[in-house]
Every structure is written in C-alpha cells, then in structure tokens.
Amino acid sequence: MPEEKQKKSVLEKALKRIEENFGKGSIMILGDETQVQPVEVIPTGSLAIDIATGVGGYPRGRIVEIFGQESSGKTTLALHAIAEAQKMGGVAAFIDAEHALDPVYAKNLGVDLKSLLISQPDHGEQALEIVDELVRSGVVDLIVVDSVAALVPRAEIEGAMGDMQVGLQARLMSQALRKIAGSVNKSKAVVIFTNQIRMKIGVMFGSPETTTGGLALKFYATMRMEVRRGEPIKEGKDVIGNVINVKIVKNKVAPPFKTAQTYIIYGKGIDREYELFNIAVNEGIVDRKGSWYYYTTLKGEEVSLGQGSSNAVQFLKDNPEIAGEIERRIREKYGLLSVEKEEQRKEKKSSGEEAS
C-alpha cells in the first residue's frame, strides 16, 4: 500500500509538471467525467445522413471527407452543411479550388451569401495555408475545401504541360494535414474535403476505384462518406432530381458502414419533407391505411396527411409544426442530440472554463 501511495504521488507531480510546461488540458485522465463530453456536431442537412453518422452530423474538431463520382451531390452536401452551420449562428468558409461555385444555387440551398467567407486560391499551397489560418483563428466553425483534386501544387502550375510531377499532390496533402489536424481539434471547427474518384490501372482483384491526393486524407479523416448517384426522380416524363446513396465508409465516433438514401432536386437541393416522410413510414411513425397516410400527434390526435405519398409530402411542407414534431420523434428514437445554437455552445464552453 505505501508503494502504491508513493506511485500515485509521483504520478500527480509528473502530471502537474506537464501541465505547467505545456498548459492545462495537455494531459488528462480519460475516465474523468469532467473531461468526457458528448460529440458536438454540425448537422448534415439531411435527416437520413444524420442518422447514418450515428452522432447526428459532422463531428466538431474533426476532418471529414466526402467523395464520389462526378455529379453525385458532393458539393450539394457541403453547401447544405454550410447552411446548417450558419443557422446555428456559426461562421463558415468555402475554399473554391475548382472555381465553380454557383452563388444562386448556394442561396437556394439556404446559404447566407452575405456572411459566407469564400476564397478562390491560385494553387494548392495557398488553399491549404488559408485553411490552416482559418482553423487557427478559432472563430470559424466550418471550412469546406472543394475539391482535393483541384488542389494543384505550385510546381505543377509553373512547370511545362508535359513535365513529370510524381507524388507532388500527395506530399502536399500529407504535410498540410499534419499541421491542420491538431489545430482543428482545438478550435472545434469542422473541415470538409470533397474528393473525386479515379480508376487504378491494372487492378485484377478488388475495387479499382481510389481517391485523389494520396493516403494522408484517408488516415486523418474522422469520417469518410461515399456518395453515389442513384435512380432519377421524375415528375411525369421530366427528370427533376436524383436519389443519392450515401455510405459512411469510415467513422471514428460511431459504428461505420451505415447507409442512407436522400433525394436531391435540381436547383433546390435536398427534399427534406420527402426524406422525412419515407423515414417516418419506415419507422412506423406515419401509418398507412390503403392509399391514405395518417399521423398520431403527441397529444393523441390522428391527422390525415392525404392520399398518396405526393399529397402526404405536400402536407408536411404546408405544416412545418407537424413535420418538426415527426423529426424530433425520429431523432429521439435514434438518440441524436438536439443541436445547440452557436451562441449557447460558446456560453457553455466559457462558463465551463470559468468553473474549472
């Protein structure tokens, strides 16, 4: 027993010295209840994807990769995340490496263009330096880099068209992510990288698909989200959108490999009510009797949503209070935390620091 007390005393002194040298919080006991906090998130803008993430959205203080084929909805998902961050009172930035952002489309998705920070960098080094500076500022909540494939190293831009530039982009990403990863965690920002799929040549077994930018992003990303375009959504003979299939291929904050299906309407983004309706029917929250749909409120009142799915979806669009109640019930069922506004989150953080 005396030996154990001596060990404990020596350990306490060592921890105290570390905190004096490197600051409070540089080392801690994992089981200490004051240190273990629930994962804070920024919603994805899609209820189905929020459920698939297991925590209700993109985890704060982490790096996220959204990758997929062309026109699969990667930028749309990133813009929806920006809109959600702004709704919470947060600051968002869009690093437009592709120089292809459509402000009209972004506005239709709910993005506040007046408060959105945007940069169209000349080369990859500049883009990643801007990301690093924004993260270190500690006041930006969400940074989107669109896309990794467009982060062209300066040497490649300045070189001749036919010059061999082996592994430049991979080295650039590896060096940048080593710097960014630590400061992202401290700032509680979310950094989303969109990425494109390429085909590996000469692959006989396994998937020939890979993403650009080397392996560093795969390692540093807390969450990797694969996006694939599904069947078209039609209104009569006209194609008005696409079903989007999402798979969480890597997740460090919840069980991975969950899937989600969402619906993107051209020019408008995610059809939230259609998505909500389908989830509610699958979960038994909305009942189907023949071709009619009914919902029983928390007060016990049975409400007719209409005949056929299109009428039921329109009813939810016309009655946001009913739609909100259904969404809350679904989130409670999956144990997803209610999202706080940014001001409330910062107040809690500051009051916690004062108490400590």
From Swiss-Prot:
Record-annotated membrane-spanning stretches: none
Q: Coiled coil among the record's keywords?
A: no
Protein's cellular compartments: Cytoplasm
- A Gene Ontology term for the protein's cellular component: cytosol
| MF annotations from Gene Ontology | ATP binding; ATP hydrolysis activity; ATP-dependent DNA damage sensor activity; damaged DNA binding; single-stranded DNA binding
Keywords from UniProt, A to Z, are: ATP-binding, Cytoplasm, DNA damage, DNA recombination, DNA repair, DNA-binding, Nucleotide-binding, SOS response
Q: What Pfam families would the database entry show? A: RecA (PF00154), RecA_C (PF21096)
- Gene Ontology biological process terms, A to Z: DNA recombination; DNA repair; SOS response
Residues binding ATP, per UniProt: 68-75
Chief location category: cytoplasm
Concerning HAMAP family, the annotation shows: RecA (MF_00268)
Its biological purpose: Can catalyze the hydrolysis of ATP in the presence of single-stranded DNA, the ATP-dependent uptake of single-stranded DNA by duplex DNA, and the ATP-dependent hybridization of homologous single-stranded DNAs. It interacts with LexA causing its activation and leading to its autocatalytic cleavage.
Q: Report the sequence similarity comment from the record.
A: Belongs to the RecA family.
| Matching NCBIfam families | tigrfam_recA (TIGR02012)
Put simply, this protein is called Protein RecA
